[in-house]
Curated annotation (Swiss-Prot):
One of its GO terms (cellular component) is mitochondrial intermembrane space. InterPro entries: Cyt_c-like_dom (IPR009056), Cyt_c-like_dom_sf (IPR036909), Cyt_c_1A/1B (IPR002327). Keywords: Acetylation, Apoptosis, Electron transport, Heme, Iron, Metal-binding, Mitochondrion, Phosphoprotein, Respiratory chain, Transport. Heme c binds at residues 15, 18-19, 81. The modification Phosphotyrosine is found at residues 49, 98. Its main location: mitochondrion. Mules and hinnies are heterozygous, having equal amount of horse and donkey cytochromes c. Binds 1 heme c group covalently per subunit. The modification N6-succinyllysine is found at residues 56, 73. This is Cytochrome c. The modification N6-acetyllysine is found at residues 73, 100. It comes from Equus asinus (Donkey). GO terms for biological process: apoptotic process.
């Protein structure tokens, strides 16, 4: 899969403005991502999601994140995530490797 250290840099540059990853981390514009893998869309406790996110009904794992992070608004039309996506597959792989580690510590 990807490189965790490179993924951490991508997270800091592109995601940390709106998301936290640590256990007990607060929600920002986007939800805290701790425990992301294996959780269904729209399920972080205490975060106000759009119906689109709540109703998508998929479980977050490597494959679903690869598709979502490429083009979030295409994958979940109606999401309030205003991020355009990451077109480079290797960057998505690195970010997912980092998320897999950081959201499970």
């Amino acid at each position: 899969m990807g490189d965790v250290e490179k993924g951490k840099k991508i997270f800091v540059q592109k995601c940390a403005q709106c998301h936290t990853v640590e256990k007990g981390g607060k929600h920002k514009t986007g939800p805290n991502l701790h425990g992301l893998f294996g959780r269904k869309t729209g399920q972080a406790p205490g975060f106000s999601y759009t119906d689109a996110n709540k109703n998508k009904g998929i479980t977050w794992k490597e494959e679903t994140l690869m598709e979502y992070l490429e083009n979030p608004k295409k994958y979940i039309p109606g999401t309030k995530m205003i991020f355009a996506g990451i077109k480079k597959k290797t960057e998505r792989e690195d970010l997912i490797a980092y998320l897999k580690k950081a959201t499970n510590e």
